[in-house]
Amino acid sequence: MLRGLVHDPSARRMGGSPGHAGLFSTADDLSIFCRMLLGGGTSGPTQVLSQETLAAMMSPSTPLDKGYLRGLGWSLDTTFNERREKRSSLPIDQSGFTGTQLWLDIETGLYIVFLSNRLHPDGKGDVFDLREQIITIAVSVAADQATPAELSTKADTPNLRSLNLSTGKNQPHAQVLSGLDVLRAEAFIRMRGQKIGLLTNQVGQSRDGVSAIDLFDGADHLELKTLFSPEHGIHGIRDDRVASARDKKTGRVIHSLYGKHLRPTPEMLAGIDTVVIDLQDIGTRFYTYMTTMAYMLEAAAKLKIKVMVLDRPNPINGIRVEGPLLDQKFLGFTGYFPMPIRHGLTMGELALLFKAENDIAVELTVVKMQGWRRRHWFDETGLPWVNPSPNMQNLIQATLYPGIGAIEGTRISVGRGTGTPFEQIGAPWIDGLQLAAALNAKGLAGVRFYPVAFIPRSSKYAGRKCRGVFILVTDRQALRPVRLGLEVAATLHRLYPAEYRLENEDNLLGSETVLIQILAGEDPAGIAKTWRADEKQWRQLRRRYLLYPFWAKLN
């Protein structure tokens, strides 16, 4: 084995134990090392590093309040993030005393090897700015490989739906087991002797389509005592308030948590040992199922009732975060916790975060999924899509929802009451040709706009002809949906200020500052840059609650 001497006075002074970041190899060999890390710890058929080791690399081992995060052997808070316009969202790096550096982006798979000797000839060299320039150029070039102009050539067809659904093509499919599937495979042994309250809806079903209600009702050694339903009811088909009822098949009472009560009462929870929660979030802050779960955690804590969350995928992947943190003044049912609009967590991870950050003294268990990776979009999991709510009918709509859902409180229809909610917007006073031209001129990555006319059957402008735009997703990886919503709102305000009335928006954006910036006519690109500190703060906070590592193969 070749051994080298680290050129690091600090390491030498302390006997070599700290500061040993020297890179004794060639760029080619270090490239192999980087590809091994990005490949989930494997090199060819060989498993070089375990998933536990990789997870330790991505987990903070330094105090989160000290402003500088490190995992096992890596910086998790590279300073280049703050100084680069086209930044990576999930970089790690390690540098050496002589100026060497490895830099990897877990999200995109980009890595950079920089070998130098800044100490030659007088020991006073400084390569920090050079390294920053190299990383900036490399990231910018990688980000620009698929430009909006190139993407638009794929969209020259009237078959919008087929193109829209092709964004996940050629993606490898995993065989993910939900928390319910895992619990079922264990024959519900964790629930032995328990009296169960089940908070679920139509999405609570196994891979083969058996409902959670039927599985718990038929399980040995436990008693399904009562049911709870979130917004839209136990079958997920209601768009208004839902009254409590009785399940026709099992005879159990269904306590609605979107009717007279938003929080479970002590009477509803009487006689229950454990509340099991099996709900599908959509990856967006104002989707209310996470709030219903949080209210259940709070109620269970007061009554010393245990809670078990059966985890399910974040449909729009568990890596991306985007948007401003929720202002404290907007905390409520559509915003339980100060987080960006696109949060990048699963329901189980959200439960852990809510419990810890809000000091909810509940005994909480999360049944993890098997096979799910943070990079996975829902169509890469092998799980069947079940509409989690009436107007969330496919993955494209879920992808657009963080942006289009954030502005639906304004005087526009977002397609509710049509076959393509959140894929189109319009109003009787919009000129679709004008709006499409204005939005396409923005050159937003991953999306194109086409003039469209539609008549909603229900919801806003029901029965009236609306003109607007159809939103065609051409690259879901490049798309930033919250930025998209911001651009749409700013463009509508500029073109139709009297009709749009943005000042009356109910602020699902969650930020008074952003609303003021749009009304003042500020550039949306500049507004989005102001979110970076919020996004960084959220990434740092959420790290301690991640149940699924970034370092993992797709399958």
Feature-to-residue mapping (PLM):
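Catalytic loop of the DD-peptidase/beta-lactamase superfamily, centered on the K-T-G motif
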Residues: 1-171
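Flexible glycine/proline-enriched surface loops and loop-helix/loop-strand junctions
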Residues: 9-19, 331-338, 417-421
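Glycine-rich, charge-decorated loop segments at or immediately adjacent to ligand/cofactor-binding or catalytic sites
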Residues: 235-241, 308-330
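Glycine-rich oxoanion-binding loops at beta->alpha junctions
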Residues: 240-271, 284
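Glycine/threonine-rich flexible loop motifs
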Residues: 281-293
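Conserved anion/nucleotide-ligand pocket segment
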Residues: 331-401
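Glycine-rich, aromatic-lined ligand/substrate-binding cores of catalytic
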Residues: 372-375, 379-451
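Conserved functional hotspot residues or short segments at active or partner-binding sites
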Residues: 426-530
